[in-house]
């Protein structure tokens, strides 16, 4: 039987491009090469599409995907040239211009099946403020917050923050992930610096109440019939789970499954599945919770293209459920084809 083509898109224009490369390299090594052949395209910081490597068999352990430092610009293509009949695209892209609906819309115009959420759910989940408002309507508990938009009266918003919240608070760009641009503030001076940082990444910013809590994550897989994993816990050796702690310094470990009461496990899985449905999720997501010292459970965010490295929480959660990394990839390809068929059938 002829192999099916799996196309990996990686890199991208967002600040999370390095995570994307790590995730794509993990996928490239884990693919079942009896079933798939792999073709890769690097998207540069400027948005150029570069044809990079092809694999018919599992690459060597030291094989690296080409990046800005190693790509051959003579291999630059028109973005639409990635089209191949029968291929499925795995957009292993994180952050803006990757998991915000942009690339998903492009792939739908090309009439190509792709792994993950569609335009609407990607866009909704990428924006933290919009996500909170959707989840509020679904009755899912979240930490108190204040939303800011560039151009609003900053002094008035700082006053609102200090009236509604108590220090410490966390300031986040609304449209970023992987803890990029997020910082903790213990006083107004630090808050002002945090707002300056967050507004460098987005014109919409979220300030959330800091809570003393454990960070618990649940994996989601499916389209209409979504399944969830047992929760896993992020165990940190740092005060704040930032980008460097996650991907560079290796200062975190995972406890899978998390050691939490059964009733909390049930609530988290129920809320994760409800959030996925409320946002119109497809394929995969990772739902992140705060489990506070007083027993309260808050949904923090739903990540529609979670980190996919071999040490990332999402594939490890499914491995704990008995679904291996290669089988997880194969399942995601099947879900992509199912979603594509339904999407095309709706175009009457």
From Swiss-Prot:
> At which positions is Mg(2+) 1 bound?
288, 301
Q: Where is the ATP-grasp domain?
A: 132-334
Q: Which residues bind ATP?
A: 162-217
Q: What class of enzyme is it?
A: ligase
- Main location, first listed in the record: cytoplasm
The cofactor named in the record is:
Mg(2+); Mn(2+)
Q: Which UniProt keywords apply?
A: ATP-binding, Cell shape, Cell wall biogenesis/degradation, Cytoplasm, Ligase, Magnesium, Manganese, Metal-binding, Nucleotide-binding, Peptidoglycan synthesis
Under which EC number(s) is this enzyme classified? 6.3.2.4
* Binding positions for Mg(2+) 2 per the UniProt entry: 301, 303
What is this enzyme's catalytic activity, as reactions? 2 D-alanine + ATP = D-alanyl-D-alanine + ADP + phosphate + H(+)
Which pathway does it serve?
Answer: Cell wall biogenesis; peptidoglycan biosynthesis
State the InterPro entries in the record. ATP-grasp (IPR011761), ATP_grasp_subdomain_1 (IPR013815), D-Ala_lig_Van_CS (IPR000291), D_ala_D_ala (IPR005905), Dala_Dala_lig_C (IPR011095), Dala_Dala_lig_N (IPR011127), PreATP-grasp_dom_sf (IPR016185)
| Textual note on the cofactor | Binds 2 magnesium or manganese ions per subunit.
Q: Which GO terms describe its cellular component?
A: cytosol
What GO molecular-function term can you cite, just one? ATP binding
Q: Localized where?
A: Cytoplasm
User: Its GO biological process terms?
Assistant: cell wall organization; peptidoglycan biosynthetic process; regulation of cell shape
Its function? Answer: Cell wall formation.
The text of the family note is:
Belongs to the D-alanine--D-alanine ligase family.
What name appears for this protein in its UniProt entry? D-alanine--D-alanine ligase
Q: What is the lineage of its organism?
A: Bacteria, Bacillati, Bacillota, Bacilli, Lactobacillales
Q: Gene of origin?
A: ddl
């Amino acid at each position: 039987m002829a192999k099916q083509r799996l196309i990996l898109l990686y890199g991208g224009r967002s600040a999370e491009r390095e995570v994307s490369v790590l995730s794509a390299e993990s996928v490239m090594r884990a693919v079942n090469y009896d079933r798939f052949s792999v073709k890769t395209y690097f998207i540069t910081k400027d948005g150029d599409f570069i044809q990079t490597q092809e694999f018919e068999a599992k690459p060597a352990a030291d094989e690296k995907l080409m990046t800005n430092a190693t790509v051959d610009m003579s291999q630059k293509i028109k973005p639409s040239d990635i089209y191949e009949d029968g291929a499925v695209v795995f957009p292993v892209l994180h952050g803006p211009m990757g998991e915000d609906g942009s690339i998903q819309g492009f792939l739908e115009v090309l009439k190509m099946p792709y792994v993950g959420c569609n335009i609407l759910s990607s866009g909704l989940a990428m924006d933290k403020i919009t996500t909170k408002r959707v989840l509020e309507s679904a009755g899912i508990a979240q930490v108190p917050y204040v939303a800011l938009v560039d151009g609003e009266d900053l002094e008035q918003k700082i006053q609102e923050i200090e009236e509604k919240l108590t220090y410490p608070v966390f300031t986040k760009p609304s449209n970023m992930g992987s803890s990029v641009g997020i910082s903790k503030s213990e006083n107004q001076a630090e808050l002002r610096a945090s707002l300056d940082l967050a507004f460098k990444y987005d014109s919409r910013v979220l300030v959330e109440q800091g809570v003393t809590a454990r960070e618990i994550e649940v994996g989601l897989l499916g389209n209409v019939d979504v399944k969830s994993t047992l929760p896993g816990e992020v165990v940190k050796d740092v005060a704040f789970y930032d980008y460097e702690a996650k991907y560079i310094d290796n200062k975190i470990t995972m406890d899978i499954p998390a050691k939490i009461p059964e009733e909390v496990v049930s609530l988290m899985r129920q809320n994760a599945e409800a959030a996925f449905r409320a946002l119109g999720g497809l394929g995969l997501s990772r739902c992140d919770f705060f489990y506070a010292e007083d027993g309260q459970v808050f949904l923090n965010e739903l990540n529609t293209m979670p980190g996919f490295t071999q040490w990332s929480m999402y594939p490890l959660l499914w491995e704990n459920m008995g679904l291996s990394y290669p089988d997880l990839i194969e399942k995601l390809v099947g879900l992509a084809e199912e979603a594509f068929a339904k999407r095309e059938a709706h175009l009457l």
